[in-house]
Amino acid sequence: MLTVSEYDLLAASLRELAPTGRNGFEGLVQRLISRVTGAEFFLAQSGAQSGRDMSSARTGATIIAVECKRYGKDRELDEDELKGKLLSAVSTIPGLDLWVLAASRPVPDQLYSGLQASAELLNVDVLALSLDGTTDGSLATLCAIEPGLVAAALRDAGVARADAVGSLLSRIQLRPE
């Protein structure tokens, strides 16, 4: 579990990334999810994205779409917007198995429950990767799988405390409670 100051360091550093693009939050999430799943993920171009910022290759495996939200602690996630993105992804990706929300802030239970209910009606699974505000959160756990990759992405983006974040994530690997 992260201390408050460790959580703040990780959250603030991730929020310094640009929200979009290969070198931003989306690109970091793309590389991390690709490493974990072993699947290739393709970033969507800016503009109309049909409910996802990236999706996995669609050849004989689990088909995954990911929506990224790099928001600060003062910007709320919009449930109606996210449900619309979920519906759009399901409508445009034949055989979609899993829709993932990757957020740099907490995902409230009510919002997640609403997404799960919509996903069930659409016959797709939903997963939230988030920083939950008090403990590691699933996004922190994902980052801790590849501390060097995260530190390099932050360093490339000019985040001053990139090496401190890399060290923090390496410590999380060693104490995964």
Stretches found by the model and what they are:
Residues 1-177:
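Mixed-charge (Asp/Glu-Lys/Arg
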